């Protein structure tokens, strides 16, 4: 059977080794004679799984001891509201850096739950002759001005990634749904990190939250119990029944990451994959990318065909070649190749080979 490479932005492809293991033990997990989906989340077997998952994640990301690791319901949008409700209180203010579609969505959700006066924004993207780049101004001010600064370091829709550290006098909250564990970061620089699982961690329905102790002392608003960080900490992420199968798969992905060399090794592979694709695009007169080199995402490579009339044929022929889910987001059009941790370099090589052949056949 030929290999299909899935370039979907999310839910994204999972490591083949993880999928095969899940398949092999779907009906009999850990010798229990039942599926991991069928056992109690409070059983000793499942608790052992969750403990191992947290230990592995802490090791992979070098998470300090003064941070809690939570496994919560929902995706990034759920955390948009959870952050506001957990940290702003009735009169708190927050600063949101806007670099693309997802950071804009975070602002929209925050303003639904607060007064406009509580949410300030700062646009980071500047456009120079059709090329988008991120410009981060110096951030100064009294620490009491904002409860937190929120930003999204990787914008999946726009193909923009912020690699430089944000120097903020306020606690930093980061939406790392699409680039968590794709490269090394210093967790101690953040007040909170959240990530929907469906790109680099596992299937949809689960979110990872990494929160520093002192953030839990901020005033909160009344909210749903299942999105209350303090309750999640108190009850070990099990105040109510968690998405157990998603948690199990995340645990297997963490094992796979460790066996693959960890985040540092993954970062090297990811850089090679992205460079291979961007170099081909830049050397072509048939494809183009509209993001400045210093802000091109390593996870989501957007590109456009010189003639949009070829888009439908490109997608159809790519699918027949085993290269699926390459259509760009409806808001920006074009194409998008999402090359998260689970995408092997062979998938990118095959994509480049296909793109080259398609261009030769249709150019001119």
Swiss-Prot record:
It comes from the Bacteria. Pfam families: Aminotran_5. InterPro entries: Aminotrans_V_dom, Aminotrans_V_PyrdxlP_BS, Pser_aminoTfrase, PyrdxlP-dep_Trfase, PyrdxlP-dep_Trfase_major, PyrdxlP-dep_Trfase_small. GO terms for cellular component: cytoplasm. Disulfide bonds: none annotated. Keywords: Amino-acid biosynthesis, Aminotransferase, Cytoplasm, Pyridoxal phosphate, Pyridoxine biosynthesis, Serine biosynthesis, Transferase. One of its GO terms (molecular function) is pyridoxal phosphate binding. Binds 1 pyridoxal phosphate per subunit. Catalyzes the reversible conversion of 3-phosphohydroxypyruvate to phosphoserine and of 3-hydroxy-2-oxo-4-phosphonooxybutanoate to phosphohydroxythreonine. Homodimer. Belongs to the class-V pyridoxal-phosphate-dependent aminotransferase family. SerC subfamily. This is Phosphoserine aminotransferase. The gene is serC.
């Amino acid at each position: 059977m030929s290999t299909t490479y899935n370039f979907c932005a999310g839910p994204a492809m999972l490591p083949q080794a993880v999928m095969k293991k899940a398949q092999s033990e779907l009906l009999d997990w850990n010798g229990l004679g039942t599926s991991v989906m069928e056992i109690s989340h409070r059983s000793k077997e499942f608790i052992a799984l969750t403990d191992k998952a947290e230990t592995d994640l802490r090791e992979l990301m070098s998470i300090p001891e003064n941070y809690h690791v939570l496994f919560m319901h929902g995706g990034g949008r759920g955390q948009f509201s959870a952050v506001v409700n957990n940290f702003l209180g009735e009169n708190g203010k927050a600063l949101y850096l806007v670099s693309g579609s997802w950071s804009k969505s975070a602002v929209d959700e925050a303003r639904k739950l607060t007064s406009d006066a509580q949410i300030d924004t700062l646009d980071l993207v500047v456009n120079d002759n059709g090329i988008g780049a991120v410009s981060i101004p110096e951030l100064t001010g009294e620490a009491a001005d904002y409860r937190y600064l929120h930003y999204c370091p990787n914008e999946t829709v726009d193909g923009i990634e912020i690699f430089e550290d944000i120097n903020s006098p306020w606690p930093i909250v980061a939406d790392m749904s699409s680039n968590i564990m794709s490269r090394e970061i210093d967790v101690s620089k953040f007040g909170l990190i959240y990530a929907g699982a469906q790109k680099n961690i596992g299937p949809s329905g689960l979110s990872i939250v990494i929160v520093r102790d002192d953030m839990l002392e901020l005033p909160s608003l009344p909210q749903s119990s299942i999105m209350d960080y303090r309750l999640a900490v108190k009850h070990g992420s099990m105040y109510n029944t968690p998405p157990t199968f998603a948690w199990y798969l995340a645990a297997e992905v963490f094992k796979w990451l460790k066996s693959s060399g960890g985040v540092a090794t993954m970062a090297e592979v990811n850089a090679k994959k992205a460079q291979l694709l961007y170099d081909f695009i830049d050397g072509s007169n048939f494809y183009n990318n509209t993001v400045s080199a210093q802000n091109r995402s390593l996870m989501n490579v957007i590109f456009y065909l010189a003639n949009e009339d070829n888009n439908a044929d490109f997608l159809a022929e790519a699918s027949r070649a085993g290269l699926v889910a390459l259509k760009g987001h409806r808001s920006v059009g074009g194409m998008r190749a999402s090359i998260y941790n689970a995408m092997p370099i062979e998938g990118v090589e095959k994509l480049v080979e296909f793109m080259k052949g398609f261009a030769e056949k249709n150019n001119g």
